[in-house]
């Protein structure tokens, strides 16, 4: 099959580039576009490409689409076309789909497509589509009805899959090309919560930080009180963080480094750096900082084979005298969300759950994982074992 796929290489690269050029990060709903027009345009391009290949396709109200191949018991391949916001610090335009083969640019040698979504998950979605085309062109008839389901809201709550479950039937079995090789049998759960911290004497007039709850905050801005403004002049932030202070407007801008919310250690949290400064002289801010960034509750002691619990406070605002912070928690697969909420309840803080996804676990010795691993090892003439993933 490898030599057959080589015939489609240039088409795959071209199609990936076309999908990457759509900025399919979440936008406000408008008309028939629940996640913004450009995300819908990306979905329609993908489905048109599949239709041109001769596949049956369905667009479910611009929430989610599917491509059908074969007959029989249904089998799902779950992918997505939405992306997290581009953020800053790109070497190439995030939606430019620049093709570059300069090894000095980092990563493995060879041709690379640069852009948001190349790996998560537009590249894999397009590649799977061409795999189905290659099988179809070779005359292969699957014994199952394969449903390539492409969502448009995987990064921000899975409203796409919620809608799919209302208008169609999700297959009982499948896999997702949205992880690492060779095969992932377990993933952490997701818990997003928004906490409100009353501030008796807030050291700022306004504060805004972060774009999305699943992205490490790389930009935070606050208008300081005169007292706080005096203190910032002699403050030195941690390495990897920059403080820019405008004396005329008393505006402090903190810049860090973005990363996926599931891997906060790869970023530098601007919100955390800002709160750390405020915590150095304000008790209410210290309360928030200690809980969210210093792990006062020892939540990060929770761990299993999928790794340790991670916390990434990513978005914050100042509302009616309260600092409101939304935090991304990824918790080990063998634990339950109630273990976290019980601890938060004891802190006597006001909070609400804004998103929850249960952990995933599939028997590594079951038929599905054994089949996937068998194909992988046979194709690469290599012996590997399935693994788990500590993030989603």
Predicted feature locations:
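Single conserved hydrophobic/aromatic residue that forms the stacking wall/gate
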Residues: 381-392
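Histidine-centered divalent metal-coordination motifs
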Residues: 80, 260, 382
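Midchain, well-structured core segments that form catalytic/ion-binding scaffolds
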Residues: 155, 161-332
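N-terminal helical capping/dimerization or prosegment-like subdomains
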Residues: 1-87, 324-326, 343
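Short proline/glycine- and acidic-rich turn/helix-capping motifs at secondary-structure junctions
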Residues: 247-253, 352-366
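Generic non-transmembrane alpha-helical segments
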Residues: 8-11, 15-22, 45, 49-53, ...
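Short, low-order "capping/linker" segments at domain edges
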Residues: 293-301, 305-306, 361-376
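Active-site metal-coordination/substrate-binding segment of hydrolases
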Residues: 74-150, 156, 168-169
């Amino acid at each position: 099959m490898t030599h057959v796929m080589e015939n489609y290489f240039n088409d795959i690269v071209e199609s990936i580039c076309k999908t990457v050029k759509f900025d399919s990060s979440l936008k406000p709903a408008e008309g028939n576009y629940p996640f913004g027009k450009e995300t819908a345009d990306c979905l329609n391009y993908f489905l048109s490409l599949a239709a041109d290949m001769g596949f049956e396709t369905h667009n479910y109200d611009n929430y989610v689409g599917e491509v059908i191949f074969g007959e029989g018991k249904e089998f799902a391949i779950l992918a997505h076309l939405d992306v997290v916001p581009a953020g800053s610090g790109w070497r190439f335009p995030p939606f430019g789909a620049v093709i570059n083969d300069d090894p000095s640019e980092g990563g493995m040698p060879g041709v690379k497509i640069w852009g948001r979504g190349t790996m998560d998950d537009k590249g894999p979605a397009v590649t799977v589509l061409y795999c189905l085309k290659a099988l179809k062109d070779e005359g292969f008839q699957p014994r199952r009805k394969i449903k390539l389901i492409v969502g448009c809201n995987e990064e921000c709550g899975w409203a796409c899959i919620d809608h799919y479950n209302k208008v169609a039937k999700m297959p009982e079995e499948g896999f997702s090309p949205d992880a690492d090789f060779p095969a992932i049998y377990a993933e952490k759960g997701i818990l997003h919560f928004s906490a409100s911290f009353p501030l008796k004497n807030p050291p700022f007039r306004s504060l805004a930080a972060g774009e999305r709850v699943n992205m490490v905050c790389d930009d935070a801005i606050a208008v300081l009180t005169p007292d706080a403004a005096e203190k910032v002049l002699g403050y030195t932030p941690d390495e990897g963080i920059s403080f820019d202070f405008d004396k005329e407007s008393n505006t402090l801008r903190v810049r860090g480094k973005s990363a996926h919310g599931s891997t906060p250690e790869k970023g530098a949290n601007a919100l955390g750096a800002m709160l750390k400064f405020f915590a150095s002289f304000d008790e209410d801010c210290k309360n928030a900082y200690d809980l969210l960034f210093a792990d006062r509750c020892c939540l990060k002691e929770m761990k299993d084979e999928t790794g340790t619990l991670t916390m990434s406070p990513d978005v914050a605002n100042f509302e009616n005298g309260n600092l409101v912070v939304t935090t991304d928690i990824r918790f080990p697969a063998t634990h339950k969300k109630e273990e976290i909420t019980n601890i938060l309840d004891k802190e006597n803080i006001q909070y609400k759950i804004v998103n929850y996804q249960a952990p995933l676990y599939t028997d590594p010795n079951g038929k599905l994982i054994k089949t996937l691993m068998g194909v992988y090892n046979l194709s690469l003439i290599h012996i590997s074992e399935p693994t788990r993933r500590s993030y989603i």
